[in-house]
From Swiss-Prot:
This is Membrane-associated guanylate kinase, WW and PDZ domain-containing protein 3. The gene is Magi3. It comes from Rattus norvegicus. PANTHER family: MEMBRANE ASSOCIATED GUANYLATE KINASE-RELATED (PTHR10316), MEMBRANE-ASSOCIATED GUANYLATE KINASE, WW AND PDZ DOMAIN-CONTAINING PROTEIN 3 (PTHR10316:SF10). It is a peripheral membrane protein. Residues 193-204 have a biased composition (Pro residues).
């Protein structure tokens, strides 16, 4: 295998780059450039002068490997020079400043010095070589004019577009060797002459056009290039093999088999491209090459890529799949009968399988067959298709006989030896008593093929002397199976009967067959079979899914248990019912009857319109539909078979009437009838629903590469139906507004799909059966489990085109939910496709006491409760959603019926048991001002099942949210509230109703939070920026390492980004310089931006001004979530945008909640006056003096740092409230006792102590519990951990004495090592205190204090009072040192990277110390007034410069947090 791969290296793998500079006289390159297009050669390197001498310059290799003399020169500083003259190549080299980058390749058999040779080779369109040929031609046409023998067309100028010459002149040029290319196109000769060594003085300088090609019109070049590209070359040839390389110049595979296939074609030179062949697969690319030269662009989110061998393939970023098929060619695909011999239709693939031989895969319809589709189509065309289905059936029936003497044709006798793989042929027929059994396929290298006497279409007359005319399919199968391996069987065959046409079966040309395992069909793309094998028997798998036992109905393979092979129902020994054939005609609204499951098959449950189904009676069991046995098909499959018939079609039904139906014999009867026909074909890949009994394990005999793997996949896909669930079939007709429901989920292969909101007055609501939170199992019979959100939307789009859809949903039945006996307000639709009334409804135990609570809120308030959701899978019988907090004074509190610990099982009557946290948020948001909660009291909750399927909100099919969710992770000890085993950490989403109107695009906020990968196609726009003196003027957040996308974090003032006007904070970056950003790291994003040089091309999706926090997706994120539906006041008019997502890591007790709510309103009037509009454009001078926002959001007590205790809000210190700015605002200096807020701490589980990002984004920087720094003190001491900026800025000097850099580093290192502990809150020092500095003794105490708080679990609940001053001093030292450490400013344009995935490419101008002091003094009086109003008896400070001693307050150490991976509890200074 490795040798094969090694042989397929493309010449591209030999390309090397180096940077060189010259030392010598100006203009002397120190290297010799030879060749040139005027000589018919590539530019190539001559001698490199590496030693001075002879007065010439020398060539010095700066980086990379030095090229060798003779190497072909491809590019100079990224500019292609192939096709240029020697003069122009030298001019390009001299144009660039040293050092210059050279891209060279060693000459080989594909690329060498001969330019004419390379242009004569034939390459696959779109390949690297084909593109290089186009580049060569473009360069040639800058200085030469192609010639042609055709007459000028309108608008063409001789000597400009073409040189129009006679045929004699053309041949003379060709014989003289003056043409680099020559050929014919549309009956005319075309040629490309060698260019002159010197350009014409009347032409533009070709070098300028090469270097600045964007400024020149290339339309005329393209016209000529197209003509030359399509012409049939006179000296056309395939490229010779490189040493140890196949002909990768064509497509990188060079299979001998495929090379021969194209050698005969001469109609178009492009046809001779061989097909792709790898690991016994071949994909025909000639159809690909036949397309027009100028194809339309690829569909959205598609990308063309190349393999290592240069072969192109296509990437669908919507579905995360790759394909060799060009999606643009599906509209131009030829019909199979129009394809040439050896050519496959578009979408077909040939498989050479060692086990099954050669067969063909139709990727478009997802089916397989043994017969070549082209040969099949041509055969059908020859015999004609004009006869109707019924006429053909009548003719075939007329020919049937049980008397061998009456057979027409030639009798052939064969003796076959059974091998371990069977007899090597497949059979069809025997599904009716009057149908022949015929050979369908003779498998390659099988016993039948080796014998050479059997042929497709042969009728099996007798087996070992036993006449089998009139025998059923299963009878014959069993006879073959009874033959031991290595034993012979004597067959008598009759040759002279054609195989029945596939179109006789109504489903042939529409769908693929789907193998069935355990009575259930496999997923789309996992198993396929040919529609030609419609009547084949089935492969039997053992219980382990092994495929060693193949029924003789398909492969006539080894023996299997006889009890698995049954005869038809008529011969199984059961009572013989009456078989009746009833002709039906499909009416405009269907067949006029409804069907339902029964133990013996699909039963007619109701006659809806007798005029279309005369003779049909209620209770009839459907055995065959249009001669297709449907006994083994499930309800959905039978429904789909009926649906596919057009209106007015005559459809005969074979029904079973009068037979007993014994439920006790259900399993046996199903098994008995399973093998009467191997017909497992379904419509549009329908998927049966789980049956209430395990049928025999059968599957199609269609070849599959790994049956065991397919079985395991299908077993996972169709595992037994969970308990306490029921499945419903809902048939909906499309209205003008659609089907009337939303779709949730599909975020990954293990994510389920759910029904979202039901649209009022829509089709789903009118039908009445569909509910939000129902799990979607199938769409029109196609299973959706494991499919992506985009694929589900595609299925719904297809259904919308059809005008109707059949949905199979699974509904969780949890205790306390009222379930009607029959979910069918509309008993049956009139489409002939009624839904199934299933009998296997789960039995219900004694229900728990549940009750509905209706909450109504005002427009300016929330509902006031917190939902906790366990993200780890709860134990059986546990509802994962519960009330975690009820906010005092809120609607939830006023109601009086919600208590902490109560479980929520439904919202507005819709089960939320299996919904994710985000989807519950959306449901409640959609509820408006009134919501109904179904509550199970905590003490009574013991039984409802739970689910942890995380469903993602559909970005395209989502209600417009009424407000924005705001995420705040609040680790804390929740065991007391939750009463649930497990480690639950809370992530709260505050539902802001009033903030909604301040957001420009509320919908996209939800999309960005959810991280929908399918939203990339929504409203993206490109922006190209040129680098300014300090970069591009924006900073990034996110990356793969932070489990989030890339977002615009900040825009620099006067930077290129903000000047452009189209980029805004919060916009998501979809592509950087053409490369998608999905899944790339932050570092890679920076590299992509740098790689663009002075320009960067961004593809952006508009945001709302909020930046998702990587903490929301952090791998250390808590394992449970809570939602706060609470009031949030509107932001200040000066704020950039409403903050929608915030993050904190502090628990809050009920006591603190009350205090916050009671004192926030009084505080708001004072604080809002002092708040200053924050900037999101990266204006560093303003940011330097911005204080960190208050810790606790208004009416959001969950954001205050520190464990809840009675003294939490002593004085005014606890009444920190969240500002309404999108980024931190300036704050006035406060009393020293006031600065007791906590430094944000990294998660405890993070070994490196990475803290969660505290950015300046609208959703960040608020309520983080960060240190409040007075205006003149410079930057936040914890800025690095908070990730406020990636670009360090120069700080103001803090006093006359400062700590050394060593001390600063030590202090910062200590704070970083405290990965999971709460750094004790550093107080804001008065200016005098700051000037005094910090002694080394204090520094040591600082480290001691940090070590003592490193492990919250080990901390004592009591603290030694003597250690408090030391700890406080250590925090002061930490803050001052951090400020000094951050005082160093990098060079212009330097980019710094913090731990939170942010980088800044611009730095801003620092403010002077005097300006900072002036600003601080301007706030002095306001600080004084505010300090007087503070509660708690704190000493006053009338001036920010006044020295005030630091009085250590009582310290409260939180109890150990039991939650794994949670940040330690923050301490609070009072």
């Amino acid at each position: 295998m490795s040798k094969t791969l090694k042989k397929k290296k493309h010449w591209l793998s030999k390309v090397q780059e180096c940077a060189v500079s010259w030392a010598g006289p100006p203009g002397d390159l120190g290297a010799e450039i030879r060749g040139g297009a005027e000589r018919g050669e590539f530019p190539y390197l001559g001698r490199l002068r590496d030693e001075p001498g002879g007065g010439g310059g020398t060539c010095c290799v700066v980086s990379g490997k030095a090229p060798s003399p003779g190497d072909v020169l491809l590019e100079v500083n990224g500019t292609p020079v192939s096709g240029l003259t020697n003069r122009d190549t030298l001019a390009v080299i001299r144009h660039f400043r040293e050092p210059i980058r050279l891209k060279t390749v060693k000459p080989g058999k594909v690329i060498n010095k001969d330019l004419r040779h390379y242009l004569s080779l034939q390459f696959q369109k779109g390949s690297i070589d084909h593109k290089l040929q186009q580049v060569i031609r473009d360069n040639l046409y800058l200085i030469t004019i192609p010639c042609t023998t055709r007459a000028p067309r309108d608008g063409e100028v001789p000597g400009v577009d073409y040189n129009f010459i006679s045929v004699e002149q053309f041949k003379a040029l060709e014989e003289s060797g003056a043409l680099l290319e020559s050929g014919t196109y549309d009956g005319n000769f075309y040629g490309t002459p060698k260019p002159p060594a010197e350009p014409s003085p009347f032409q533009p300088d070709p070098v300028d056009q090469v270097l600045f090609d964007n400024e020149f019109d290339t339309e005329s070049q393209r016209k000529r290039t197209t003509s030359v590209s399509k012409m049939e070359r006179m000296d056309s040839s395939l490229p010779e093999e490189e040493e140890d390389e196949d002909k990768e110049a064509v497509n990188g595979s060079g299979s001998m088999e495929t090379r021969e296939m194209h050698s005969e074609s001469s109609d178009c030179w492009m046809k001779t491209v061989p097909s792709y062949n790898q690991t016994n697969r071949s994909m025909d690319f000639r159809n690909y090459m036949m397309r027009d030269e100028n194809l339309e662009p690829l569909p959205k989110n598609w990308e063309m890529a190349y393999t290592d061998t240069g072969t192109i393939y296509f990437i669908d970023h919507n579905t995360k799949t790759t394909t060799w098929l060009d999606p643009r060619l599906c509209k131009k695909a030829k019909a199979p009968e129009d394809c040439e011999d050896g050519e496959l239709p578009y979408g077909w693939e040939k498989i050479e399988d060692p086990q099954y031989g050669t067969y063909y895969v139709d990727h478009l319809n997802q089916k397989t067959q043994f017969e070549n589709p082209v040969e099949e189509a041509k055969r059908k065309k020859q015999i004609g298709q004009a006869e109707t289905h019924s006429a053909k059936t009548d003719v075939e029936r007329a020919h049937f006989t049980r008397d061998p003497s009456q057979l027409k044709g030639v009798l052939v006798r064969a003796s076959l030896k059974k091998s371990t793989m069977g007899f090597g042929f497949t059979i069809i027929g025997g599904d009716r008593p009057d149908e022949f059994l015929q050979v369908k396929n003779v498998l390659k290298d099988g016993p039948a093929a080796q014998d050479g006497k059997m042929a497709p279409g042969d009728v099996i007359v007798d087996i070992n002397g036993n006449c089998v005319l009139g025998h059923t399919h299963a009878d014959v199968v069993q006879m073959f199976q009874l033959v031991p391996v290595n034993q012979y069987v004597n067959l008598t065959l009759c040759r002279g009967y054609a195989l029945p046409d596939d179109s006789e079966d109504p489903v042939v040309d529409i769908v693929a067959a789907t193998p069935v395992i355990n009575g259930q069909s496999l997923a789309k793309g996992e198993a396929c079979m040919s529609t030609q094998d419609f009547k084949l028997g089935a492969m039997v798998l053992d219980q382990n899914g092994k495929s060693g036992k193949l029924l003789s109905s398909d492969r006539l393979n080894g023996p299997s248990d006889s009890n698995e092979q049954r005869a038809s129902l008529a011969s199984s020994g059961s009572s013989q019912p009456e078989l009746v054939t009833i002709p039906l005609v499909k009416g405009p609204k269907g067949f006029g009857f409804a069907i339902a499951d029964s133990p013996t098959g699909q039963k007619v449950k109701m006659i809806l319109d007798s005029q279309w189904c005369q003779g049909l009676q209620k209770g009839d069991i459907i055995k065959e539909i249009y001669h297709q046995n449907v006994q083994n098909l499930t309800h959905l499959q039978v429904v789909e078979v009926l649906k596919q018939f057009p209106v007015g079609a005559d459809v005969p039904l074979l029904i079973l009437r009068g037979g007993p139906c014994s439920p006790t014999k259900t399993a046996k009867m199903k098994t008995d009838t399973k093998e009467t026909s191997g017909s497992l074909e379904t419509i549009n890949e329908p998927t049966p629903q789980p049956m209430p009994f395990p049928p025999s394990i059968i599957r199609s005999g269609s070849p599959k590469l790994d049956p065991s793997e397919v079985y395991l996949k299908s077993k996972t896909l169709y595992e037994d139906k969970p308990p306490n669930t029921k499945d419903l079939d809902v048939f909906l007709r499309k209205q003008e507004s659609g089907f009337g429901f939303r779709v949730l989920g599909g975020d990954g292969p293990d994510q389920s799909i759910y029904i979202g909101a039901i649209i009022p007055l829509g089709a789903a609501e009118k039908d009445g059966r569909l509910r939000a939170a129902d799990e979607l199992m199938c769409i029109d019979g196609i299973p959706v489990k494991g499919k992506s959100h985009k694929q589900v939307l595609d299925l719904m789009t297809t259904a919308a085109r059809n005008g109707h859809v059949l949905l199979t949903v699974r509904r969780k039945i949890f205790y306390g939910e009222k379930q009607p006996e029959d979910e069918s307000p509309q008993a049956f639709s009139q489409s002939g496709s009624p839904r199934l009334n299933r009998t296997e409804l789960p039995t219900r135990s004694a229900p728990q006491e549940s009750y509905d609570v209706i909450l109504q809120r005002k427009e300016n308030e929330g509902f006031g409760f917190v939902i906790l959701t366990s993200k780890s899978k709860p134990p059986p019988g546990v509802i994962p959603h519960k009330i975690g907090r009820v906010i005092d004074g809120s609607p939830a509190d006023r109601c009086g019926r919600l208590k902490v610990g109560d479980h929520i099982s439904a919202v507005n009557g819709q089960s939320i048991v299996d919904l994710s946290h985000d989807n519950i948020v959306q449901l409640i948001k959609d509820a408006g001002v009134t919501v109904t909660l179904t509550v199970v009291a905590e003490e009574e909750h013991h039984g409802p099942p739970s689910g942890t399927n995380s469903a993602r909100q559909s970005p395209a099919l989502q209600h417009r949210p009424m407000g924005q969710a705001q995420a705040t992770h609040i680790p804390g000890d929740r065991t007391a509230l939750e009463g649930e085993v497990g480690k639950d950490v809370c992530s709260s989403y505050r539902h802001s109703w009033s903030d909604h109107k301040h957001l420009a695009q509320p919908d996209t906020a939800v999309i960005s939070v959810v991280g929908s990968r399918h939203s990339q196609s929504l409203g993206c726009y490109p922006v190209e920026l040129e680098r300014g003196p300090r970069g591009f003027g924006f900073s990034l957040r996110g990356g793969k390492e932070y489990n989030m996308g890339l977002f615009i974090l900040r825009l620099a003032e006067d930077g290129p980004a903000i000047k452009d006007g189209r980029i805004h904070v919060g916009d998501q970056i979809v592509e950087i310089n053409g490369e998608p950003t999905q899944g790339i790291t932050h570092t890679r994003a920076i590299e992509l931006i740098q790689a663009g040089g002075n320009k960067v091309l961004l593809l952006l999706r508009p945001g709302t001004g909020l930046i998702p926090d990587h903490g929301d997706w952090d791998i250390y994120s808590p394992s449970s979530s809570n939602v706060i539906y609470d009031e949030q006041p509107p932001p200040l008019p000066s704020s950039h945008s409403a903050a929608t997502f915030e993050e904190s890591h502090v628990p809050v007790t009920e006591d603190s909640l009350i205090r916050v709510q009671t004192c926030e309103k009084a505080e708001e009037l004072k604080d809002t006056v002092q708040e200053k509009k924050s900037t999101l454009n990266g204006s560093q001078p303003e940011m330097k003096y911005q204080s960190i926002q208050k810790n606790v959001s208004k009416k959001d007590p969950s954001r205050s740092h520190g464990h809840g205790d009675k003294n939490l809000l002593k004085g005014e210190n606890g009444v920190t409230r969240r500002g309404r700015s999108a980024s931190p605002k300036k704050s006035v200096n406060r009393h020293s006792e006031e600065h007791l807020e906590k430094i944000p701490r990294p998660l405890r589980s993070d070994p490196k102590g990475k803290s969660r990002d505290r950015s300046l984004s609208p959703r960040k920087g608020e309520n983080k519990g960060q240190v409040t720094i007075k205006a003149g003190s410079g930057q936040d001491p914890c800025r690095k951990d908070r990730g406020r900026s990636s670009s360090p800025r120069k700080q103001q000097k803090i006093g006359g004495n400062s700590l050394s850099n060593t001390e600063g580093k030590l202090s910062e290192a200590g704070s970083r090592r405290a990965a999971g502990l709460s750094s004790d809150s550093p107080e804001q020092l008065p200016e005098g205190k700051e000037k005094s500095g910090v002694s080394r003794k204090d520094l040591k105490l600082s480290q001691l204090g940090k070590n003592r708080t490193r492990s919250p679990e080990k901390r004592s609940s009591k603290v030694d009072e003597a250690s408090l001053p030391s700890k406080k001093t250590s925090d002061t030292a930490s803050r001052v040192v951090s400020e000094k450490e951050k005082g160093r400013k990098p060079g212009t344009g330097e980019r710094s990277r913090d731990k939170t995935g942010e980088s800044v490419q611009t730095s801003a101008k620092p403010l002077t110390q005097e300006a900072g002091e002036k600003m601080a003094l301007s706030k002095a009086s306001e600080v004084t007034d505010r300090g007087k109003e503070r509660a708690g008896g704190a000493p006053e400070s009338s001036s920010p410069v006044k020295k005030a001693p630091i009085t250590p307050g009582p310290w409260r150490v939180p109890r150990a947090n039991k939650v794994t991976g949670t940040a330690g509890m923050a301490d609070k200074q009072l």
